[in-house]
A protein has these predicted regions:
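Short glycine-/aliphatic-rich beta-strand segments at the starts of folded cytosolic domains
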Residues: 15, 19-22, 27-61, 124-130, ...
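Small-residue-enriched alpha-helical segments and adjacent helix-cap loops
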Residues: 23-27, 51-204, 212, 357-358
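Flexible, glycine/charged-enriched surface loops at secondary-structure junctions
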Residues: 78-85, 116-117, 156-163, 220-221, ...
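A generic structural motif
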Residues: 87-94, 228-232, 236
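A glycine-rich phosphate-binding loop feature that marks nucleotide/adenosyl-phosphate handling sites
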Residues: 123-126, 163-172, 315-328, 348-349
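Iron-sulfur cluster-binding cysteine motifs and their immediate structural context
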Residues: 208-231, 237-260
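A hydrophobic, small-residue-rich beta->alpha segment in the mid-to-C-terminal subdomain
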Residues: 266-309
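C-terminal, charged low-complexity interaction regions
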Residues: 324-358
């Protein structure tokens, strides 16, 4: 057998980063219990316990903040911590007596504890204006404004019927989980890109630009005697792929870009099958820096859900029970033609779940 050697191919095996109690009881866990907001214990068949303290953190972190988290992990949990897929930081403790001192230190640093169980978890989001060239709205700004209003649902000061997941993506390329979250905030472009014909031949390869369009809306054309392109607006879905390969095809517009709200997505197989999010509010104008219209719309949906849903019902299950007409009535939104999903390839027969229908 060949001798094992160290390479730089792939990440190191995750096992070397697991706390000893998890290694000893891997695959042998009996149950878990939420002790208080943001604190959970997993109990193994052997009686071993691992305590989790979940704290909120921004998606974009400074190195100094990460070092603070590492210092806290060294102090209270032998260096063991992890980040969740929704940007929470979780500290993994073997000693229950260190939970409260850790929470106290986190509070002094300004990081609240919560988000476990029937609570609102951190909002997973995309890059936004800080980095992405095709964003129809900002990510960090909108998420900060929304979480400032919904903060009591994270800490447990206000109750929810079940867990709630909110996601944000700055455009429909969707590098956030907006397709499968209870509430999704999605930046939308509403106009086809503007073509700068004078600059396009100097900056872009036309065959590559034509090939970049997933719907075939871009065609080669001659404009004022020089090679360029044309866009068939009926086929354009405002994805911005063309802008990615050619800066002369500009998708962003301060006047027509905005935000849409989607509801009813879920990943879990519990009770009903996983669901895709569905459109609730087609368009809200961008209004930085605090986006009051967007914040108000999301808060209204959360409060309406909290008031009307049954215990353990996710938003998708609540809407299935009361029906979409009643849902729109409760949130005060008019049903319009823009809510109709006319995408012909979205067949109901496509398998989206491990659940089987007999």
């Amino acid at each position: 057998m060949a001798e094992e050697r160290i390479t730089d191919i792939g990440p190191p095996h995750y096992e070397q980063f697991l706390p000893p109690v998890i290694k000893e009881n891997y695959g042998k866990w009996d149950h878990h219990e939420i002790l208080k907001p943001g604190v959970m214990v997993h109990v193994a068949e052997s009686g071993g316990k691992i305590f989790t303290v979940r704290a909120a953190s921004p998606r974009l972190l400074a190195v100094t903040t990460i070092r603070k988290f590492c210092d806290l992990a060294d102090t209270y949990c032998n260096g063991y911590l992890r980040f969740t897929s929704r940007n929470n930081v979780e500290f993994l403790l073997a000693d229950e007596s260190k939970i409260d001192p850790l929470i106290k230190d986190l509070a002094e640093y300004g990081f609240p504890v919560g988000g476990l169980g029937a609570k609102l978890s951190n909002i997973v989001h995309t890059q936004g204006w800080v980095h992405c060239h095709s964003a129809a709205s900002d990510a960090s700004g909108v998420v900060k404004a929304v979480m400032d209003e919904l903060f009591p649902y994270f800490t447990g000061e206000k109750d929810l019927p079940a867990k709630m997941r909110i996601a944000y993506a700055c455009c429909l390329n969707m590098c956030g989980a907006v397709h499968c979250s209870d509430i999704a905030i999605l930046g939308v472009h509403t106009r086809a890109p503007v073509i700068e014909h004078d600059d396009l031949p100097k900056m872009c390869e036309i065959p590559t630009l034509v090939a970049s369009c997933p719907t075939g809306a871009i065609r080669p054309a001659t404009v004022d005697g020089q090679q360029s392109i044309e866009i068939v607006e009926e086929q354009c879905m405002y994805c911005g792929n063309c802008y990615t390969v050619c800066p002369a095809v500009k998708i962003n517009s301060a006047d027509t870009d905005g935000i849409s709200i989607w509801v009813g997505g879920k990943v879990s197989n519990s009770r009903i099958a996983p669901q895709f999010s569905k459109l609730a509010i087609p368009f809200i104008p961008n209004n930085p820096p605090r986006w009051p219209e967007t914040v108000g719309a999301v808060k209204n949906i959360v409060e309406t859900y909290a008031e009307n849903a049954r215990k353990h019902e996710r938003i998708a299950e609540w809407i299935d029970r009361i029906g979409w007409p009643k849902f729109f009535e409760l949130i005060g939104q008019e049903f319009t033609k823009y809510h109709i999903d006319d995408f012909k390839h979205a067949g109901e027969t496509y398998t989206r779940t491990a659940q089987l229908r007999h």
